[in-house]
Amino acid sequence: MALPADPDCYWVEPDRLLAGEYPRAFVESTARARLRALLDCGIRTFVDLTQAREPLAPYESLLISEAEERALTVSYHRHPIRDADIPSDAGMREILATIRASIERGDPVYVHCWGGIGRTGTVVGCWLVETGRAGDDVFEAIKALRAGTMKRRTQSPETSDQADFILDWPSRPSD
Protein backbone atom coordinates (compact mmCIF):
# COMPACT_ATOMS: atom_id res chain seq x y z
CA MET A 1 0.00 0.00 0.00
CA ALA A 2 1.07 3.58 -0.57
CA LEU A 3 2.31 5.81 2.23
CA PRO A 4 0.08 8.60 3.44
CA ALA A 5 1.49 12.02 2.52
CA ASP A 6 1.00 13.21 6.08
CA PRO A 7 2.05 12.34 8.81
CA ASP A 8 5.74 11.78 8.08
CA CYS A 9 6.15 8.00 8.24
CA TYR A 10 7.74 4.91 6.70
CA TRP A 11 6.91 1.24 6.23
CA VAL A 12 9.03 -1.05 8.42
CA GLU A 13 7.24 -4.02 6.84
CA PRO A 14 5.08 -3.07 3.85
CA ASP A 15 1.36 -3.23 4.59
CA ARG A 16 2.05 -4.58 8.09
CA LEU A 17 4.04 -2.11 10.23
CA LEU A 18 4.20 1.64 9.65
CA ALA A 19 6.25 3.94 11.90
CA GLY A 20 6.29 7.70 12.22
CA GLU A 21 5.33 10.86 14.02
CA TYR A 22 2.33 11.74 16.18
CA PRO A 23 -0.71 11.67 13.88
CA ARG A 24 -2.68 14.44 15.62
CA ALA A 25 -2.34 18.04 14.45
CA PHE A 26 -3.36 21.19 16.30
CA VAL A 27 -6.10 21.94 13.76
CA GLU A 28 -8.84 19.30 13.97
CA SER A 29 -9.48 19.18 10.22
CA THR A 30 -5.78 18.46 9.62
CA ALA A 31 -5.82 15.82 12.35
CA ARG A 32 -8.83 14.13 10.80
CA ALA A 33 -7.18 14.20 7.36
CA ARG A 34 -4.05 12.56 8.80
CA LEU A 35 -6.07 9.86 10.52
CA ARG A 36 -8.12 9.23 7.36
CA ALA A 37 -4.88 8.87 5.39
CA LEU A 38 -3.62 6.26 7.86
CA LEU A 39 -6.93 4.39 7.77
CA ASP A 40 -7.00 4.58 3.98
CA CYS A 41 -3.58 2.92 3.76
CA GLY A 42 -4.89 0.05 5.89
CA ILE A 43 -3.79 0.90 9.43
CA ARG A 44 -6.08 -0.67 12.04
CA THR A 45 -3.92 -0.66 15.19
CA PHE A 46 -2.34 2.47 16.65
CA VAL A 47 0.53 2.11 19.14
CA ASP A 48 1.14 5.43 20.90
CA LEU A 49 4.48 5.72 22.72
CA THR A 50 3.84 9.22 24.11
CA GLN A 51 3.01 10.02 27.72
CA ALA A 52 -0.39 11.50 28.53
CA ARG A 53 1.24 14.59 30.06
CA GLU A 54 3.09 15.57 26.87
CA PRO A 55 1.76 18.77 25.26
CA LEU A 56 -0.08 16.91 22.52
CA ALA A 57 -3.78 16.93 21.75
CA PRO A 58 -5.24 13.43 22.14
CA TYR A 59 -6.52 11.76 19.00
CA GLU A 60 -8.20 8.53 20.15
CA SER A 61 -11.75 9.95 19.95
CA LEU A 62 -11.10 11.42 16.49
CA LEU A 63 -9.67 8.08 15.36
CA ILE A 64 -12.73 6.19 16.56
CA SER A 65 -15.02 8.73 14.88
CA GLU A 66 -13.18 8.48 11.55
CA ALA A 67 -13.13 4.67 11.74
CA GLU A 68 -16.86 4.48 12.54
CA GLU A 69 -17.64 6.68 9.52
CA ARG A 70 -15.92 4.02 7.40
CA ALA A 71 -17.38 1.06 9.32
CA LEU A 72 -13.85 0.05 10.35
CA THR A 73 -12.70 -1.54 13.59
CA VAL A 74 -9.55 0.00 15.03
CA SER A 75 -7.62 -0.37 18.25
CA TYR A 76 -5.56 2.18 20.14
CA HIS A 77 -2.85 1.18 22.61
CA ARG A 78 -0.80 3.59 24.69
CA HIS A 79 2.57 2.26 25.83
CA PRO A 80 4.12 5.41 27.30
CA ILE A 81 7.88 5.98 27.22
CA ARG A 82 9.39 9.20 28.55
CA ASP A 83 10.68 11.41 25.70
CA ALA A 84 14.30 10.64 24.73
CA ASP A 85 14.30 7.66 27.10
CA ILE A 86 13.97 3.88 26.89
CA PRO A 87 11.24 1.58 28.15
CA SER A 88 11.70 -1.14 30.72
CA ASP A 89 12.41 -4.56 29.26
CA ALA A 90 8.89 -5.63 30.24
CA GLY A 91 7.51 -2.50 28.59
CA MET A 92 9.28 -3.29 25.32
CA ARG A 93 8.05 -6.87 25.43
CA GLU A 94 4.48 -5.57 25.84
CA ILE A 95 4.89 -3.15 22.92
CA LEU A 96 6.31 -5.84 20.65
CA ALA A 97 3.58 -8.28 21.74
CA THR A 98 0.90 -5.71 20.82
CA ILE A 99 2.49 -5.22 17.40
CA ARG A 100 2.95 -8.95 16.82
CA ALA A 101 -0.63 -9.83 17.84
CA SER A 102 -2.08 -7.14 15.59
CA ILE A 103 -0.05 -8.22 12.59
CA GLU A 104 -0.97 -11.86 13.19
CA ARG A 105 -4.66 -10.82 13.20
CA GLY A 106 -4.10 -9.11 9.86
CA ASP A 107 -4.39 -5.62 11.36
CA PRO A 108 -1.61 -3.32 10.10
CA VAL A 109 0.02 -1.24 12.84
CA TYR A 110 1.08 2.40 13.10
CA VAL A 111 3.65 2.90 15.88
CA HIS A 112 4.59 6.44 16.79
CA CYS A 113 5.94 8.81 19.40
CA TRP A 114 5.95 12.62 19.07
CA GLY A 115 8.54 13.12 16.34
CA GLY A 116 8.76 9.53 15.15
CA ILE A 117 12.50 9.36 15.75
CA GLY A 118 13.74 8.37 19.21
CA ARG A 119 11.16 6.21 20.96
CA THR A 120 9.74 5.03 17.65
CA GLY A 121 13.22 4.19 16.36
CA THR A 122 13.91 2.22 19.53
CA VAL A 123 10.77 0.11 19.04
CA VAL A 124 11.50 -0.34 15.33
CA GLY A 125 15.07 -1.37 16.15
CA CYS A 126 13.94 -3.99 18.67
CA TRP A 127 11.32 -5.24 16.18
CA LEU A 128 14.06 -5.62 13.55
CA VAL A 129 16.23 -7.54 16.05
CA GLU A 130 13.32 -9.86 16.84
CA THR A 131 12.72 -10.45 13.14
CA GLY A 132 16.32 -11.36 12.36
CA ARG A 133 18.50 -8.24 12.11
CA ALA A 134 21.58 -7.87 14.29
CA GLY A 135 24.18 -5.33 15.36
CA ASP A 136 24.87 -2.28 13.21
CA ASP A 137 22.72 -3.80 10.45
CA VAL A 138 19.71 -2.66 12.49
CA PHE A 139 20.79 0.99 12.36
CA GLU A 140 21.56 0.81 8.64
CA ALA A 141 18.13 -0.73 8.09
CA ILE A 142 16.41 2.06 10.06
CA LYS A 143 18.35 4.67 8.08
CA ALA A 144 17.34 3.04 4.79
CA LEU A 145 13.69 2.69 5.85
CA ARG A 146 13.56 6.38 6.82
CA ALA A 147 15.29 7.59 3.63
CA GLY A 148 12.07 9.00 2.19
CA THR A 149 10.95 10.87 5.30
CA MET A 150 11.24 14.59 5.94
CA LYS A 151 13.26 13.93 9.11
CA ARG A 152 15.68 11.49 7.44
CA ARG A 153 18.73 13.54 8.42
CA THR A 154 17.96 13.14 12.12
CA GLN A 155 19.51 10.00 13.60
CA SER A 156 17.05 7.35 14.72
CA PRO A 157 17.08 6.29 17.45
CA GLU A 158 18.17 9.62 18.93
CA THR A 159 20.19 8.77 22.03
CA SER A 160 23.06 6.45 22.81
CA ASP A 161 20.91 4.83 25.52
CA GLN A 162 18.28 4.02 22.90
CA ALA A 163 20.90 2.59 20.53
CA ASP A 164 22.45 0.54 23.34
CA PHE A 165 19.01 -0.77 24.30
CA ILE A 166 18.56 -2.09 20.76
CA LEU A 167 22.05 -3.61 20.64
CA ASP A 168 21.45 -5.34 23.97
CA TRP A 169 17.89 -6.41 23.16
CA PRO A 170 18.51 -10.00 22.06
CA SER A 171 20.47 -10.79 25.20
CA ARG A 172 18.39 -8.83 27.70
CA PRO A 173 17.21 -10.99 30.59
CA SER A 174 13.54 -11.00 31.55
CA ASP A 175 12.50 -8.52 34.24
Report residues per predicted region.
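Cys-dependent protein tyrosine phosphatase-like superfamily
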Residues: M1-Y110, G115, T122-D175
